[in-house]
């Protein structure tokens, strides 16, 4: 149990200065380098930036990004990460909401951002080597101060900045370390971009434990041949990703325990872990434990979790997302806000110390999504779920991924789940096609098919629909199935449903 994230990382540097904190494709950086560099940057930021203002940090999957994050935290600033693979308009959209006084260029900005101080990479590199160390941590981020702000997409196209405090992060890190049994010195894959809160799942627990982050930049993950050649060389103990990324790795027949002898932990979050993916991982990695977790960005990475064992896979065609972490209460409520009985579907309400204070500079959206229960903060998740008597939770989809077709309410993720069970289908995502009156006219599925002997897509579709028809009501069967070699992913590694919706409704 730690009581401060910043001092816990500094303690590792004091006790194990030569230990490797970060490994970027073979270039290694020690905890001593992380501490000295972040201390010098903190001194520089304390002199250069207005007090306590959040600061945008633009860059990729590099050690410099982590050093800047820590330097900002030590000097009392929240950081707002923007990944280099974000569209250019993302930078201006975030700045329009955040009004930050400065942007730190770890990588060069692709566009000009007027009326804001730009701290460029040469200045950073000079400061991290020569600037005086920060004299003390008395102004460092602590308690309810914002530690980071991650922007998620908003329904109006205007992104929402989720404010995560030091205490929110502390609650998450302590739970992650204790519940998932991670050991000191853990070697963890660092694949999600820092603008995606899943990255926090590997970043801070690993550093607090004196472990090593093995960066996996997008240039590697985008090329399957390079990816499959790189992964076995990393010597991983811990794998953190979306299930979609693991499904890519599973395309490589060599992705198994023999070639990854030290891999003991799979931690999944960000989207639904399907039964057959879990089964394949359990089969291929008998010495590893597969953890399924769940949590909106607004509740700091994840608030539920459990080990997915062979018994769980056998018992539940649709896997549970686990139990609430010990310091958190989760309720399932109906549309009137009343708690429902065990097994009844409703919306998840999350109350506890890792729930955000709200959206940056957006009191209206904050008031709609957040509430107080005594001294605790609560969040309306917009996620549908059921809960058993003993508190095990099953995710059932999004309230905003519900569509009505011919009067029937359909969960798109429910259709996906069942399509993914069809023997001919490797991966599928279902989207609505709207008519000119903006009503749903059709369900269309995009699918990656397994190798098969059908003479045409039409014959394959007939077989898929016949098998699917044994699992779901007729009205849930997509009218069309479009086959692709792969489905588009967002920058965060999730299936890009919005891109598919746009494609069928252009």
UniProtKB/Swiss-Prot annotation:
One of the Pfam families matching this protein, by short name: AMP-binding
Keyword line: ATP-binding, Cytoplasm, Ligase, Nucleotide-binding
Pathway annotation: Cell wall biogenesis; lipoteichoic acid biosynthesis
Catalytic activity: holo-[D-alanyl-carrier protein] + D-alanine + ATP = D-alanyl-[D-alanyl-carrier protein] + AMP + diphosphate
Record GO cellular component, one term: cytoplasm
GO biological process: lipoteichoic acid biosynthetic process
Enzyme class: ligase
Residue positions binding ATP: 152-153, 292-297, 383, 395-398, 494
MF terms (GO), sorted A to Z: ATP binding; D-alanine [D-alanyl carrier protein] ligase activity
PROSITE patterns xref list: AMP_BINDING
Binding locations of D-alanine: 197, 301, 494
E.C. code: 6.2.1.54
Entry's localization field: Cytoplasm
Family per similarity comment: Belongs to the ATP-dependent AMP-binding enzyme family. DltA subfamily.
Protein purpose: Catalyzes the first step in the D-alanylation of lipoteichoic acid (LTA), the activation of D-alanine and its transfer onto the D-alanyl carrier protein (Dcp) DltC. In an ATP-dependent two-step reaction, forms a high energy D-alanyl-AMP intermediate, followed by transfer of the D-alanyl residue as a thiol ester to the phosphopantheinyl prosthetic group of the Dcp. D-alanylation of LTA plays an important role in modulating the properties of the cell wall in Gram-positive bacteria, influencing the net charge of the cell wall.
Protein name (record): D-alanine--D-alanyl carrier protein ligase
């Amino acid at each position: 149990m730690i009581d401060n994230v910043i001092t816990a990382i500094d303690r590792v540097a004091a006790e194990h200065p030569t230990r490797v904190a970060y490994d970027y494709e073979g270039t290694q950086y020690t905890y001593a380098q992380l501490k000295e560099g972040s201390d010098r940057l903190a001194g520089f930021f304390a002199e250069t930036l207005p007090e306590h203002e959040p600061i945008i940090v633009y860059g990729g999957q590099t050690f410099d990004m982590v050093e800047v994050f820590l330097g900002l935290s030590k000097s009392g600033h929240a950081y707002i990460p923007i990944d280099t693979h974000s569209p250019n308009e993302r930078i201006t959209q975030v700045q329009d909401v955040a009004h930050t006084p400065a942007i730190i260029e770890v990588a060069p900005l692709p566009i000009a951002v007027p009326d804001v101080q730009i701290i460029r990479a040469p200045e950073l590199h000079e400061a991290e080597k020569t600037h005086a160390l920060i004299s003390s941590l008395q102004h460092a981020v602590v308690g309810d101060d914002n530690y980071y702000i991650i922007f998620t997409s908003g329904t109006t196209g205007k992104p929402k900045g989720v404010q995560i405090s030091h205490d929110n992060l502390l609650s998450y890190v302590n739970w992650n370390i204790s519940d998932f049994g991670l050991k000191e010195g853990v070697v963890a894959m660092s694949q999600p971009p820092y603008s995606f809160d899943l990255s926090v799942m590997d970043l801070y627990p690993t550093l607090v434990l004196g472990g090593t982050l093995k960066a996996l930049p997008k240039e590697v993950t985008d090329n399957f041949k390079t990816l499959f050649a790189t992964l076995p060389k990393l010597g991983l103990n811990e794998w953190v990703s979306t299930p979609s990324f693991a499904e890519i790795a599973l395309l490589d027949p060599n992705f198994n325990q023999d070639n990854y002898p030290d891999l003991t932990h799979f931690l999944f979050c960000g989207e639904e872990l399907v039964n057959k993916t879990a089964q394949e991982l359990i089969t291929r990695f008998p010495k590893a434990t597969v953890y399924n977790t769940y949590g909106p960005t607004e509740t700091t990475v994840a608030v539920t979790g459990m080990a997915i064992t062979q018994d769980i896979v056998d018992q539940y065609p649709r896997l549970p997302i686990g139990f609430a972490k010990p310091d958190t209460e989760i309720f399932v409520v109906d549309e009137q806000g009343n708690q429902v009985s065990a097994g009844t579907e409703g919306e998840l309400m999350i109350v506890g110390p890792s729930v955000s204070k709200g959206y940056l500079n957006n009191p209206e959206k904050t008031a709609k999504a957040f509430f107080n229960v005594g001294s605790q903060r609560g969040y309306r998740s917009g996620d549908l779920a059921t809960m058993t008597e003993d508190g095990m939770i099953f995710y059932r989809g999004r309230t905003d991924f519900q569509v009505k077709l011919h009067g029937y309410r359909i969960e798109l993720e429910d259709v996906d789940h069942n399509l993914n069970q069809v023997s001919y289908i490797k991966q599928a995502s279902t989207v609505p096609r709207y008519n000119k009156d903006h009503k749903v006219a059709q369900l269309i599925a995009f699918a990656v098919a397994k190798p098969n002997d059908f003479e045409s897509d039409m014959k394959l579709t007939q077989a898929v629909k016949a098998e699917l028809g044994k699992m779901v009501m007729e009205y849930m069967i997509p009218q069309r199935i479009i086959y692709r070699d792969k489905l588009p992913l967002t920058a965060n590694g999730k299936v890009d449903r919005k891109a598919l919706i746009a494609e069928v409704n252009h």
